UniProtKB/Swiss-Prot annotation:
Protein name: Cyclin-dependent kinase 11B
Regions of compositional bias (Acidic residues) in chain numbering: 303-364, 383-392
Function description: Plays multiple roles in cell cycle progression, cytokinesis and apoptosis. Involved in pre-mRNA splicing in a kinase activity-dependent manner. Isoform 7 may act as a negative regulator of normal cell cycle progression.
Cross-link Glycyl lysine isopeptide (Lys-Gly) (interchain with G-Cter in SUMO2) mapped to chain: K641
GO-annotated biological processes: apoptotic process; mitotic cell cycle; protein phosphorylation; regulation of apoptotic process; regulation of cell cycle; regulation of cell growth; regulation of centrosome cycle; regulation of DNA-templated transcription
Post-translational modification summary for this protein: During FAS- or TNF-induced apoptosis, isoform SV9 is cleaved by caspases to produce p110C, a fragment that contains the C-terminal kinase domain.
Organism in which the protein naturally occurs: Homo sapiens (Human)
Length: 795
């Protein structure tokens, strides 16, 4: 920088004059010297040496040149002057002083300029250092702030997870307390009911003892009177005339049972029927409050077993009392063997008359008890069971009766009783029970291939579900769809699949019903009434049970082909069951061509929407993925209005497939005929947000994979890490309970589309029961006791 400044310095006037003078002298010297040199060269070139030839080719003549010789000479002179060595010039004292002052002044200026330049550089460097320092300070502050924010976010996340964990624990504790409270209330009710029954039985036994004692005293008084009258009127007779004047018994046979024995048996039967009618009301109330179907069934069976044991104890006590009474009477009879035979004949006649009276009273009581009309099928089976019980007990009456005994015929029934009695049922399918043995409670819903009712078994008082099969072509034989459904559902028994008890039939071939265990809810109607969605642990529990049921079906080579939330049932115990096998069928390997129009539209796999005819278990797994999303959001995942709209909704969320991600996609029938809009990205993650973890979204993507060959199976789905991360699946017994919507009057829901080729004509499937033989659904007495009309038959 200093050299550049020296070249820029301003010259003084003296220096300029001296410079001009020096240049002028140099020019004059150069001119003289140039002229001298040019003359020498010309003289040399003009005179050729000996033997030298002039070469005209070497001569270059420049014509019309803008430069003149004088100009070139001047330029050359200037150059020579600048390069010439000048002799030292003589300066005066005054000039030297002036020159020294100039030099000092120049030196000061140079020093000032150097110092200013250095200060400027120092300031620039200082600014740069300050800038760097501030930049580092800002970076440190930003880093500290980011670290603080990260730490704060971690603390907030930990606090949120802690609050969420506390909330879940409080919720679980609350549910546990409620469950224990319900169990305690149930135990208290059962204890009170047992105490009430025991008290009633005790009072009944005391009343029977009083009646038997009263009858015994009356017989003794009457026998004393007869003895007194016969002692005065009738002569003594030999013992052999006892058979002739008696009731037809031989002398060696045992005496008939006392007259109160049939009456006691009939009273016990009346008591049993009263207890059964009480048990019906009690079991109904207990089932409404019970939280689990299995526990309610076990408690019901346990109460019935306890009741049977207590009744057996009563019968043993009554038989022991009767045996004691018989022994006393035999002793009295042995003492009176010496009396006349007329007394014995009158006594036997009195016993026969008392027996007839007791039988008449029993018939009257039975006529009063038979409020609900029963079929002969029920009555015959009941009479056979009563006969077996009487034979097993070995009562004196049954052992003492012979061919000669007189038993009066049953009295003729009145016209009113004839109207109450039902005609004998002749089942169309041998070995199946009649539908008359069930009492209809309400109509639940239409399935794919039939109508479902909630009913009660009249014999066991158990609540069951009756599904009436569609039999529109019964004249051509048994429908293949109904046969396939029965065969499939009987083959696929599993804890997470609806349990089939039996098949019952109506009056003719078009009334066939599947009897299944009653389950309180279906997930579709339950989610419509829930105010809050399922918790993550509850969703995992439901998905695990669903995958277990689907795995069992696929392991047995069964395709369900209609998995949706309305076909998934949930009990009060938190047990999920797969139902409605109207579209199910078996499949084999290699795959065959099936109809592509299966599965309800919202849950239909893309290969079915695009017209594929060869498909396998992957269609069920796509439906499982749609159900997974619906459990999280309580809304259908792809609610399309038509097949084209359904395809567009799937492509919009998952992206349009290609041959790369779906081999064979371009060969599908629908792809060849039409062009779909392009959606390059998968936008499904945005629909769930915080509702689904990364592992859960990974499982969702595997359920909703386009290529069926890469779609996850039910067995692999159960092994996914989503079910092992927190929050873990809850125990089914910890599920909350809701009011059973199926026990209320059916309300038509028009939200979910119907399955293909099923359900469209079934909304009036049970309406013709009012005109023909079969179920009669009475809406005026819904929820009545066993004495209500229930299922009524019309012939």
């Amino acid at each position: 920088m200093g050299d550049e400044k020296d070249s820029w310095k301003v010259k003084t006037l003296d220096e300029i004059l001296q410079e001009k003078k020096r240049r002028k002298e140099q020019e004059e010297k150069a001119e003289i010297k140039r002229l001298k040199n040019s003359d020498d060269r010309d003289s040399k070139r003009d005179s050729l040496e000996e033997g030298e030839l002039r070469d005209h080719r070497m001569e270059i003549t420049i014509r019309n040149s803008p430069y003149r010789r004088e100009d070139s000479m001047e330029d050359r002179g200037e150059e020579d002057d600048s390069l010439a060595i000048k002799p030292p010039q003589q300066m005066s004292r005054k000039e030297k002083a002036h020159h020294r002052k100039d030099e000092k002044r120049k030196e000061k200026r140079r020093h000032r300029s150097h110092s200013a330049e250095g200060g400027k550089h120092a300031r620039v460097k200082e600014k740069e250092r300050e800038h760097e320092r501030r930049k580092r300070h800002r970076e440190e502050q930003d880093k500290a702030r980011r670290e603080w924010e990260r730490q704060k976010r971690r603390e907030m996340a930990r606090e949120h997870s802690r609050r969420e964990r506390d909330r879940l624990e409080q919720l679980e504790r609350k549910r546990e307390r409620e469950r224990k409270m319900r169990e305690q209330q149930k135990e208290q009710r059962e204890q009170k009911e047992r105490e009430r029954r025991a008290e009633e039985r005790r009072k009944e036994r005391e009343a029977r003892r009083e009646v038997s004692a009263h009858h015994r005293t009356m017989r003794e008084d009457y026998s004393d009177k007869v003895k007194a009258s016969h002692w005065s009127r009738s002569p003594p007779r030999p013992p052999r005339e006892r058979f002739e004047l008696g009731d037809g018994r031989k002398p060696g046979e045992a005496r008939p049972a006392p007259a109160q024995k049939p009456a006691q048996l009939k009273e016990e039967k009346m008591e049993e029927r009263d207890l059964l009618s009480d048990l019906q009301d009690i079991s109904d109330s207990e089932r409404k409050t019970s939280s689990a179907e299995s526990s309610s069934a076990e408690s019901g069976s346990g109460s019935e077993e306890e009741e049977e044991e207590e009744e057996e104890e009563e019968e043993e006590g009554s038989t022991s009392e009767e045996s004691e009474e018989e022994e006393e009477e035999e002793e009295e009879e042995e003492e009176e063997t010496g009396s006349n035979s007329e007394e014995a004949s009158e006594q036997s006649a009195e016993e026969v008359s008392e027996e007839e009276m007791s039988e008449d009273e029993e018939r009257e009581n039975e006529n009063h008890l038979l409020v609900v009309p029963e079929s002969r099928f029920d009555r015959d089976s009941g009479e056979s069971e009563e006969a077996e019980e009487e034979v097993g007990e070995g009562t004196p009456q049954s052992s003492a009766l012979t061919e000669g005994d007189y038993v009066p015929d049953s009295p003729a029934l009145s016209p009113i009783e004839l109207k109450q009695e039902l005609p004998k049922y002749l089942p169309a399918l041998q070995g199946c029970r009649s539908v008359e043995e069930f009492q209809c409670l309400n109509r639940i819903e239409e399935g794919t291939y039939g109508v479902v009712y909630r009913a009660k078994d009249k014999k066991t008082d158990e609540i069951v579900a009756l599904k009436r099969l569609k039999m529109e072509k019964e004249k051509e034989g048994f429908p293949i769809t109904s046969l396939r459904e029965i065969n499939t559902i009987l083959k696929a028994q599993h804890p997470n699949i609806v349990t089939v008890r039996e098949i019952v039939v109506g009056s003719n071939m078009d009334k066939i019903y599947i009897v299944m265990n009653y389950v309180e809810h279906d997930l579709k109607s339950l989610m419509e009434t829930m105010k809050q969605p399922f918790l993550p642990g509850e969703v995992k529990t439901l998905m695990i049970q669903l995958l277990r049921g689907v795995k069992h079906l696929h392991d047995n080579w069964i395709l369900h082909r209609d998995l949706k939330t309305s076909n998934l049932l949930l009990s009060h115990a938190g047990i999920l069951k797969v139902g409605d096998f109207g579209l199910a069928r078996e499949y084999g390997s290699p795959l065959k061509a099936y109809t592509p129009v299966v599965v309800t539209l919202w849950y239909r796999a893309p290969e079915l929407l695009l017209g594929a005819k060869e498909y396998s278990t992957a269609v069920d797994m796509w439906s499982v993925g749609c159900i997974f999303g619906e459990l999280l959001t309580q809304k259908p995942l792809f609610p399309g209005k038509s097949e084209i709209d359904q395809i567009n909704k799937v492509f919009k969320d998952l992206g349009t497939p290609s041959e790369k991600i779906w081999p064979g996609y371009s060969e599908l029938p629908a792809v060849k005929k039409m062009t779909f809009s392009e959606h390059p990205y998968n936008n499904l993650r945005k629909r769930f947000g915080a509702l689904l973890s990364d592992q859960g979204f990974d499982l969702m993507n595997k359920f909703l994979t386009y290529f069926p060959g890469r779609r996850i199976s039910a067995e692999d789905g159960l092994k996914h890490e989503y079910f092992r991360e927190t929050p873990l699946p809850i125990d089914p017994s910890m599920f909350p309970t809701w009011p059973a919507k199926s026990e209320q009057q059916r309300v038509k829901r028009g939200t979910s589309p119907r399955p293909p080729e099923g359900g469209l004509g079934y909304s009036q499937l049970g309406d013709d029961d009012l005109k023909e033989t079969g179920f009669h659904l009475t809406t005026t007495n819904q929820g009545a006791s066993a004495a209500g009309p229930g299922f009524s038959l019309k012939f």
